[in-house]
Structures are given as C-alpha cells and as structure tokens.
Regions:
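Short, low-complexity, intrinsically disordered N-terminal peptides in bacterial proteins
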Residues: 1-23, 111, 159, 165, ...
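N-terminal auxiliary segments of SAM/dcSAM-dependent transferases
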Residues: 2-78
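Generic alpha-helical structural context detector
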Residues: 32-36, 63, 103, 129, ...
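Residue-level signal for pocket-adjacent positions within structured domains
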Residues: 45, 66-69, 75, 80, ...
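SAM-dependent Rossmann-like transferase core, predominantly class I methyltransferases
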Residues: 48, 60-155, 186-187, 318
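An acidic site on a long C-lobe helix of protein kinase domains
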Residues: 54, 94-97, 262
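S-adenosylmethionine
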Residues: 103, 134-173, 177-321
C-alpha cells in the first residue's frame, strides 16, 4: 500500500508491482504516470517523500488502474494529432489509428474554400476537430447521441483547438464568407436552435443527435464531407474485449450481430446530404473492407477505396456521391 513519507521510487515500485499482478500491460509506464498525476512531479527528478495527500491520491489511482480502468480516463485527456482531448468514463478514447481517418477526410476537401462537414457518432469530436485542424476554414458539426459522451464533445469543441495557431471560429455567428457570397446553410432544427440561443464559441459545433434519424433533418446536397467512426464490433467481438476496452461505453463499440448496422444506415441514408462529388469517409474494423465497400457499391456510391493504418491494416473507406 502507498503510504505517507514513502520515497518516490519506492512508491512507484509498489504501484508497478500491483499493476503487474493485476495484469496491466506497460505497468512500469503506468506507475510513473500515476505518480505524476498524484504529485505533479516526475519520479526521475524527485526525491521528496510523499505527503499524506499525495499518498492517498496515488493509492486511489493505483486501485482504479489495477481494476483495469483505462489510463486515459485517470489522466482525463488523450493526445490526438497535435492537440489534447478531454476523455473520461462514458466516452470512447480516441485511438492513434483514427488519426489516419482524420487526415484522409481532410484530404478530400483539397481546393474547397469553406467546406461544410458533418461528423457522425462523434464521441470526443476527434474526427471533426481533426478535420478542422487540417482545414481551418471548414464549418464542422459533430453529432453524438450519448449524453455522457456529449459532455466531453462539448468541452472539446470549446477548448481542444485553442492555442494551436488556428482561429477558433464562432460558427453560431455568420462568418464573413456567409455574409458575402456563400448561400445561407440550413443545418436542420437542432443546430438552428443552437444558433438562435447564441451559445459560446466553438471550433466545431456539437449537436446531440442519432445517426439513425439525423439524416431526416439535413437539406439535400449541401455538405462536402461526412466523416464517421461508428460502432463496428460484432456481438462475438463484444464477448472478447480486453479489460480496459470493456470499461469503455458499449454504445460506442457494439454494432449488432454482424457489426454493420451503422454502415448500412450511412450507405442508405446520407448520400443525398452530400453535394455531387461530396465525400464519405468511414473508419472500419480491420476485417470489414469487403463488407463495407459492398454496402456502398450496392447503394450507388462512387470512387470507393480503402486506406490502411500505421500497422498496415485496413482502417478507412472513402467514397463519393456521384457527380
């Protein structure tokens, strides 16, 4: 047990041993990180004994991590591209491979001055914010159903891109482009209500909504990009989750018996919301390339291709509304 007056290295050894016994991967790294969270110090640069408050904080963190709570939840943040996202219980932690999806999505917008972008099943908002980071002029709306996840989405929409050398645009106010020669855009009742209420400035606009019905609110042909990392695990895969993943929200992971229910809805209902030539960019599971590309082809999508992640696995499918 971590106790008052313990020296830093002894405390970290104690935590590492307990995490190792609990089966935590990277127990040495986690122990050092938990020490930093509890004390605000780097164990390599500190020799002051722990105070009672620090020891108690480290003991709580160790107990939670030993129960296989994700380290990112304990830290309260997760790096994505070159910015930090708020995370915690109730929202899916962004994965490094999803950065590939954000980059692929942004690349579809090359040459478009002020693209309109919709991020569905947004979670933390990592994809929508990633697109905004690559394309500062993009007008991005992020849609998330879960009330728990929406708390993090709203916070990230306000805070994640500040200090990144980009202008954080208040998308609730008419932009210079909207005032000039770009036609007024109708995002549907949800976002229009937010605009009317004059909410705080956001880099991207958070909206609470359901992928399975949100398409009904969208006008035809006014988006340049729809991006999504929907749930895609099968029922069988949900039974075999790693302990840390099992503590993330099932709502963000499970997609029916075959893992394709969200892709069916996207393929069937969202094409007309895009302008001709507009892009759909989807994260997929590493074994889903054939199934997802077939769904898109069956529903009249064009220019379908697959992009691999850093590990060489199929990770992203892109398609376009025919011109």
């Amino acid at each position: 047990m971590v106790s008052e007056a313990m020296l830093p290295r002894a405390a970290v050894r104690e935590v590492e041993q307990r995490l190792t016994a609990a089966g935590c991967p990277d127990a040495d790294f986690d122990a050092r990180e938990l020490f930093r969270l509890a004390t605000g110090r780097d164990v390599r640069l500190s020799d002051r004994p722990l105070t009672a408050e620090q020891a108690a904080a480290l003991e709580v963190l160790c107990t939670r991590r030993a129960a296989r709570e994700p380290l990112q939840y304990l830290c309260g943040s997760r790096s994505f591209l070159d910015f930090e996202l708020a995370v915690g219980p109730g929202v899916l932690c962004p994965r490094a491979d999803t950065e590939v999806v954000a980059q692929a999505a942004a690349e579809t917008l090359a040459g478009i001055a002020a693209p309109r972008v919709l991020d569905l099943c947004a979670g933390t908002g990592c994809l929508g914010l990633g697109v905004k980071r690559f394309c500062p002029a993009a007008q991005v709306t992020c849609v998330e159903k879960s009330p728990e996840a929406f708390v993090y989405l709203e916070k990230n929409a306000r805070c994640a891109l500040t200090g990144q050398g980009r202008q954080t645009e208040n998308v609730l106010e008419p932009s210079a482009l909207e005032q000039a020669d770009v036609p007024a855009f109708d995002w549907g009742p949800s976002l229009n209500a937010l605009r009317a209420d004059r909410k705080p400035a956001y880099a991207v606009q958070p909206v609470q909504g359901d992928l399975f019905t949100y398409w009904e609110t969208l006008p035809e042909g006014q988006l340049e990009l729809i991006v999504s990392n929907p749930p895609y695990l099968t029922a069988a895969e949900m039974e075999q989750l790693q302990p840390e993943v099992a503590q993330e929200p099932a709502m963000a992971l499970e997609a029916g018996e075959d893992g394709l229910v969200f892709y069916r809805a996207l393929a069937q209902h969202y094409k007309n919301a895009l302008c001709p030539g507009g892009a759909l960019v989807l994260e997929i599971g590493w074994q889903q390339r054939e199934a997802v590309t077939a769904l898109l082809a069956e529903n009249g999508w064009a220019e379908i291709r697959c992009i691999q992640d850093f590990g060489g696995n199929d990770r992203c499918v892109t398609a376009r509304r025919p011109k």
